Regions:
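Histidine-anchored nucleotide/phosphate-binding helix
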Residues: 1-14
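Short alpha-helix within the catalytic core of nucleotide-sugar-dependent glycosyltransferases
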Residues: 8, 34-37, 83, 98-109, ...
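Short internal beta-strands
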Residues: 19-27, 116-118
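Active-site-proximal specificity loops/subdomain of glycosyltransferases
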Residues: 31-80
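Short aromatic/hydrophobic "clamp" motif used to bind/position activated sugar donors
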Residues: 88
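Catalytic metal- and UDP-sugar-binding loop of GT-A-like glycosyltransferases, i.e.
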Residues: 91
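Conserved donor-nucleotide/metal-binding helix-loop-beta segment in metal-dependent transferases, i.e.
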Residues: 95-129
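A glycosyltransferase accessory/donor-loop signature
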Residues: 146-287
Length: 287
């Protein structure tokens, strides 16, 4: 579903372009395959689905519970796509494109293996210190504009695989940490509006935080994701409130702020009530 929304957003905002869309996964249900076919037919674009054998990736670490080793597939994509193209744009499945994608694909890579956006300054400071990166730079690998020949020349896939079996305590994340250790800042850095949050002017939204728009709508970017879901072949979703548990008190603060901006006073007061109650419960140690 998430992939379908990402692709729908790209195609809706780039109707003048022809695409070859390559989808890499470790498995796919019949329902999702049927929906993908519907997506291809609706937009008259070419789709290719790769169901990957994950055995070669089993020695890579899994750092967080909601991740899987599928994140490491991006490290072998250049070898698979090499007979088909010189360059390609890699995107995570938790993204939205809200404008002209050629803003990215027209970028001159200047001899670098790929272009990517930096993490936030706070994340860069933490990550570069944790990973002992000499460059002081750290990119997000959720979107990469890749030159396959340069990637191959620098043997990036092979260098990534050299980290198989490494002590997981060396890393705070997964493929992104390894990619940054391999490149250590030697890429073309592009504006964060091409891999960003909800700032004005963002071209590519990236929902890489703990709150996901397919779980709940907490801001305008989440609502935009639901809009593209409605345009896709996948079923629309209800918009439930966050659970009324102390751990979710801050989500009610976000809802309160959004309601205030939209001048929905009744909703604002409702969310203020639950924000206050749940925050008190959290301080009292109630579950």
């Amino acid at each position: 579903m998430q992939m379908g929304v990402t692709v729908t957003s790209v195609l809706e905002n780039n109707t003048d372009k022809a695409f070859a869309i390559h989808i890499f996964c470790d498995g796919v249900s019949k329902e999702n395959l049927d929906k993908t076919r519907q997506l291809a037919e609706k937009y008259q674009q070419n789709f290719y689905v790769y169901i990957m054998d994950m055995k070669p990736f089993q020695m890579f670490h899994i750092k967080t519970r909601h991740f899987s080793r599928v994140t490491y597939l991006r490290s072998v994509m250049p070898k698979i796509l090499k007979p088909l193209t010189d360059k390609y744009l890699y995107m995570d499945a938790d993204m939205l494109c809200v404008g002209d994608i050629s803003e990215i694909t027209d970028i001159d890579l200047q001899g670098y293996p790929f272009a990517a956006a930096s993490e936030t300054p706070q994340a860069v400071a933490y990550k570069t210190s944790f990973l002992h990166q000499k460059s002081g730079k750290h990119f997000n690998d959720g979107l990469m504009w890749i030159d396959i020949a340069e990637w191959e020349r620098e043997q990036i896939t092979e260098k990534v695989f050299s980290y198989q079996g490494a002590d997981p305590s060396r890393f705070s994340g997964q493929s992104q940490d390894i990619m940054n250790l391999v490149l250590d800042g030697d890429i073309l850095f592009i504006d964060r509006r091409y891999n960003g949050g909800s700032d004005k002017g963002t071209l590519i939204y990236h929902f890489c935080g703990s709150n996901k728009p397919w779980h709940m709508v907490l801001n305008d970017a989440d609502a935009l994701w639901r809009h593209y879901l409605d345009l896709s072949p996948w079923d629309s979703m209800p918009d439930p409130l966050p659970p009324k548990t102390p751990q979710h008190y801050f989500n009610y603060k976000l809802l309160m702020e959004r309601s205030w901006q939209k001048k929905k006073l009744g909703n604002c007061l409702q969310y203020l009530f639950w924000y206050t109650v749940l925050k008190i419960e959290l301080k009292l140690g109630m579950q």
